[in-house]
Each structure stands twice: as C-alpha cells, then as structure tokens.
Amino acid sequence: MSEEYEVTFIDRDERSARFLVRGVTPAFANGLRRAMIADVPTLSIDTLRVVENSSVMFDEQLALRLGLVPLTTPDDYEPGETVTLAIDVEGPATAYSGDLVSSDDKVQPADENIPIIELKDDQQLELEADATLGRGKDHAKHQGGVAVGYRHLQRVEVVGEKGEFEDDEPEILRGVIEEDGDLIETGEFDNDLSQRYPGKEVEVEEVPNAFVFDVETDGSMPVEELVLKAAESIAARADELEEAVAL
C-alpha cells in the first residue's frame, strides 16, 4: 500500500455508499471489508426481563427477534456499557420496533416499522431489555455493515472500429468504469459496453491498486462512520502487533 491513498465518493446517502479507493493493496481492501462487517461495535439487545407475555410466542423467540432490531449507536459508548429499552403493548395490535422506549434518546431503533409480534384480544407484551456493545465477529446481530463488497476499478479504452458485418454482442460489465479519467457507473448504459460504445472495439483492464466499494449499513450509524471506524480498528490492531513484536 502506498503512503498516500485517495478516496472518492461516487454515490452515497445515510445508509449506503459507493466509493473508490486508490493506492491500496488487495489485502488492505479485503481487510477493510472484513473490518466493516466484523470489527465495528454496535448496540444490540442482549438480555430481557419479561413482565408479561401472553402472546403466542415464547420469551426466547421474542429475545431473538428483539436482538436483531438495529439500534442507533452513539460513538461515545464504551464496551460494557448498557442501555435499557422498554415496551408495553396491549392487543389487538401489532408491536413494532418503534414501540420500544429507550432510556437514552441517542439510542433508538434504526427503523420504527419492524414488526415484533401480533397481539390478539386480551394479549399483552410488557418487558425491559438491555442492549450492549458487541462486534460482528462475536454475533451477527452486531454487524453494522450488512452488505459490504468491492471490486477492481475497470478502465475502458476504445482501440478501434468493429468490422462492417460484425454484430454488437452484449458485453456486460457491472460497477464503475474509468473512461478518460472520468468515473462512470455502468447502470447509465444498462451495464452493457456495446451500448456505451456501439460499433467500437474496446479494451478493458483493471486499474492497479484501485477498488470500488459498495457498502450498506443496518442504520446503526452513518456509512461514513462505519468506514472510518473500520479503518481505525485496522490501525489499532497494527499498533497492538507492533507493541507485541517490540517486547
């Protein structure tokens, strides 16, 4: 990996992003992907105290469902800290994640419309739940990066004209291409190079040490924060290794 690298965002919103990283090795790109999935801590419900559950679902099944509800995770929480959430819903009604009331306003369900259980007449769900920090490598419910992938940046160059009687066969390429120094998403031409360059012979090559990442979070944190924390976790592990070797 070079001493300097460059990051260019191609598309992004609160929960997903596509960005280009130049100047990194395939090993670092894969390490960053793994860190976004496994090493960034998030809050998830871990323990329940059930006051009333007259629904058709066992307490243990409710615990599994509640544990998979993504919670917003402030960056000032430390390992071992907990936050308590409570829910009290009477039927006939559907209990949703938005019915969870948190003891910390900064910690809320990332989505309010996740169904937990449908309650019939005279049924009630009342409980308290403790959420703790954890990492995806310990349990999948703590995976802040729910979809993380990358691929080499492809450079496309026109090298000639096709023959007069040569058909334009579909040439599928997905992701992002580099054309004369510009970045172009392949969705603009239906992922088919023959539509972008009709009648042209093109050459496609991988750009060395340049990778396009596609990242989506579960809503526990913005996508930029997920990427930065993943990079910080790699740096922290490198420091730990350096200290261990120096002993």
UniProtKB/Swiss-Prot annotation:
Claim: Transferase is one of the keywords in the record: yes
Any GO molecular function: DNA-directed RNA polymerase activity
GO BP term, pick one: DNA-templated transcription
Keyword Phosphoprotein: no
Alphabetical UniProt keywords: Cytoplasm, DNA-directed RNA polymerase, Nucleotidyltransferase, Transcription, Transferase
SUPFAM superfamilies in UniProt: Insert subdomain of RNA polymerase alpha subunit, RBP11-like subunits of RNA polymerase
Pfam families assigned to the protein according to its UniProt record, in alphabetical order: RNA_pol_A_bac, RNA_pol_L
The organism's place on the tree of life at top rank: Archaea
Reaction equations catalysed: RNA(n) + a ribonucleoside 5'-triphosphate = RNA(n+1) + diphosphate
Top-tier EC class: transferase
EC code(s) of this entry: 2.7.7.6
GO cellular component: cytoplasm; DNA-directed RNA polymerase complex
Localization in the cell: Cytoplasm
Annotated PANTHER family: DNA-DIRECTED RNA POLYMERASE, DNA-DIRECTED RNA POLYMERASE II SUBUNIT RPB3
Subunit (UniProt): Part of the RNA polymerase complex.
Function recorded in the entry: DNA-dependent RNA polymerase (RNAP) catalyzes the transcription of DNA into RNA using the four ribonucleoside triphosphates as substrates.
Family statement drawn from the similarity comment of this UniProt entry: Belongs to the archaeal Rpo3/eukaryotic RPB3 RNA polymerase subunit family.
Protein's name according to its UniProt entry: DNA-directed RNA polymerase subunit Rpo3
